[in-house]
Structures are given as C-alpha cells and as structure tokens.
C-alpha cells in the first residue's frame, strides 16, 4: 500500500499524559508486553450479534454497547474488545460495520459510518432520551440480506468517551481501530484519525488498561509511533481470507509487521494458528504476545488447547460459558490422601499449564487441523 511520507515530527504532539505508562500493563520496552496470565476477552462486550442465528445468545444483548460492556464486566475477565471508527466531525464512536442501515417507509437507506456526523450517527436505534424515537436500525448480513437489528436487550449507540466514563473502571479495553479493507489511506489521513482516538484515550482512560489493535498494518504502525503508553497488536486473518495487501495474509507476515513497527503482539484468526502451530514458537521467540479470535473460540475444548499451546488469550462471544469451561479444565484436581501437608485453598484452584509430550501435542494439533478443514 503506497502512502505519502509525512515525518512524525511534523505531526502535532499529543499531551504529555499520553506518553506515561498505564498501571496494570507490563510494558517494559517497546516490543515487550505480557497479559496477566491466560486472558478471556469479551468480543464486542458480552458477544457479537448474529441476527439470523437460531442461537438466542447471539441476539441477547446489543453488541458494542455500554450495556454489553457492563454485562461482560460481571465476569472475571481482563478485557473486552470493541471497534472504533471516527465520524466526519472527528468523534470516535463504537460500531463494527463500515455501513449503517435504516428503514423508512419500506425503503432501506445506507450510510458509511465515517461519512456521518456524531449527531447523525446517534440518531440510529434506541435513544438515550426515552421520549425520542430513533431511526430503525438495520444490519446487512454477509449474505447480503438486510435485517432489523432485533435483540433481547437493546441499547443506544455510544462513543468511546462514554465507554471510558460509564464502563467498570477495572475492565481493560482492547480498542480495534477500524478501517475499510477496500480503501487506500494516505498517511496524513490515518494520523488525523488516530490522533482523534488518542486524544480521547489520553483524556479519559485514567488507569484503565488499554490495548490497541488493527487489521490495517499502516495504522497499527502509526499508532505505535504516535504513543508509547499502550501496547499495539496487529490483527490478521492468517490466510483464512486473502487480501491485496500481502502483509495481511500469513502469521509470518504479521510477525514481520510487528518487528518493523515495534508492535507488542498479534491477534490471529484461531484457525490460522491451528493450521500453522509452528508459528507460535516464532512469535514467542520474537518476544510478541499472541491472542486469537474466531468462532472456534466459542468451543471450550478449542480454547483449552490454545492454553496448552501457550497462547496468551482468546476473544470470545460466549463469555459466561467459556469462563466456566476453561475454569473447570484448568483447575488442579483435588489432592489425594497423603501424609504430606495439604496445599492451601488458593493452591487448589491455581491455574497451571499441564505437561504434554511433544508427540501428544503434535497429535492433537494434527487432529484439530483435520477438523477445521470441514
């Protein structure tokens, strides 16, 4: 992707507070970051919405909403993940899709989120002032069908500032910086957008743990150049989808992006890791953290396998179920009768990675690789 060169020194500086270290994050040097143990991270809060799904959990709480974030905060998780875009009047808002849809008099209207002002964006869906009626919020599925965005527990759209102000303070934010896959961005534009986000983070994050991530490799590198407080992860499909930008097509390319940009880690589609488990050791040798996302992360056994493999954390939709299943699988079995002193109660529930032989791990990985082909 060709970008016009702009010296970072020419970019207006952010407040000094942006450059301080945030408590709770082990960020000892530009390419070193570790999460506090194996982390379960709530996807778009308590889980993403799939409107056509027969599984009620996929239509439980409005994704990327304050209600969803605080619902996730009720569980013992370290972070939630959500998507941030910037409106045309420079306000960071939380919304996943590139386009937003509404219906009026039987006609479906489409708008690009970043072409809307903040006030226009907030007109969609339930309104904070209950006496007001917002535009009927619709969503376009991957199959191209436009559906009414119906969930059991709805909530209004929100800004990044509101999330910092209204979500449980101890819950970390994994902020995905959203950009259109089909657009080639000039460096100046990326800098402008990222500064809008960083300004809000600087003003409102306080001591909250924050991780930035992006599928856009130039944006990921730039946010690292513009601040040294918070870790930056590069998101990759790891070959599950092929993009024109080759940097997005493999874990090996993702490692290179991180090393070139001084990033702290990779967030990979989980099937890409299971297909290429050898990349895990390369990632660790490069002093990078590794998180995963994807549908398989809603299966407890697949999450546990990643824990065994040394992956640092998983982004999941079914937060309650995955927390319960992984806790059961990771709890040390009760001690047998023995004249030796009993371990403390805390030791009984200590999470320890089990020991598997290389042959056993290879067999499990081969089995997983075969399963995900179907």
Curated annotation (Swiss-Prot):
Stored PROSITE patterns: GP_PDE
Tissue: Expressed in roots, shoots, flowers and siliques.
Record field: catalytic activity: a sn-glycero-3-phosphodiester + H2O = an alcohol + sn-glycerol 3-phosphate + H(+)
Ranges of biased composition (kind: Pro residues): 332-342
GO molecular function: glycerophosphodiester phosphodiesterase activity
Induction note: By phosphate starvation.
Domain GP-PDE: 38-326
EC number: 3.1.4.46
CDD domains, A to Z: GDPD_GDE5_like_1_plant
Domain of life: Eukaryota
Keyword set, alphabetical order: Glycerol metabolism, Hydrolase
Residues covered by region (Disordered): 330-349
UniProt keyword Phosphoprotein present: no
Family assignment from sequence similarity: Belongs to the glycerophosphoryl diester phosphodiesterase family.
Protein name, as recorded: Glycerophosphodiester phosphodiesterase GDPD2
Provenance organism: Arabidopsis thaliana
């Amino acid at each position: 992707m060709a970008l016009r060169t702009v010296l970072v020194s020419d970019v207006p500086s952010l407040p000094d507070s942006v450059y301080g270290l945030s408590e709770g994050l082990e960020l000892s040097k530009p390419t070193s970051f570790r999460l506090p143990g194996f982390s379960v991270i709530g996807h778009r809060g308590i889980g993403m919405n799939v409107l056509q799904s027969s599984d009620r959990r996929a239509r439980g709480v409005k994704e990327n909403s304050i209600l969803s974030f605080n619902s996730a905060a009720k569980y013992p998780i370290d972070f939630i993940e959500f998507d941030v875009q910037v409106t045309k009047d420079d306000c960071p808002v939380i919304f996943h899709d590139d386009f937003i849809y509404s219906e009026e008099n039987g006609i479906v209207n489409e708008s690009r989120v970043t072409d809307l002002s903040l006030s226009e964006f907030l007109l969609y869906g339930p309104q904070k002032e209950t006496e007001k009626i917002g535009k009927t919020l619709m969503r376009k599925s991957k199959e191209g069908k436009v559906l009414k965005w119906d969930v059991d527990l709805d909530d209004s759209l929100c800004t990044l500032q509101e999330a910092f102000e209204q979500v449980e303070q101890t819950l970390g934010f994994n902020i995905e910086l959203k950009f259109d896959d089909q657009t080639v961005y000039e460096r100046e534009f990326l800098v402008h957008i990222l500064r809008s986000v960083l300004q809000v983070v600087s003003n409102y994050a306080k001591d909250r743990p924050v991780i930035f991530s992006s599928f856009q490799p130039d944006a990921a590198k730039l946010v690292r150049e513009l601040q040294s407080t918070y870790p930056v992860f590069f998101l990759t499909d790891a070959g599950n989808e092929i993009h024109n930008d080759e940097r997005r097509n493999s874990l090996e390319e993702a490692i290179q992006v991180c090393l070139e940009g001084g990033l702290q880690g990779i967030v990979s589609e989980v099937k890409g890791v299971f297909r290429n488990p050898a990349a895990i050791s390369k990632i660790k040798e490069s002093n990078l953290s590794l998180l995963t996302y994807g549908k398989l992360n809603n299966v407890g056994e697949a999450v546990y396998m990643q824990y065994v493999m040394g992956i640092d954390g998983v982004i999941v939709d079914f937060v309650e179920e995955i927390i319960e299943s992984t806790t059961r699988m990771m709890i040390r079995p009760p001690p047998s009768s023995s004249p030796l002193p009993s371990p403390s109660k805390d030791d009984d529930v200590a999470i320890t990675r089990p020991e598997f032989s290389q042959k056993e791990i290879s067999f499990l990985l081969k089995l997983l690789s075969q399963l995900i082909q179907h």
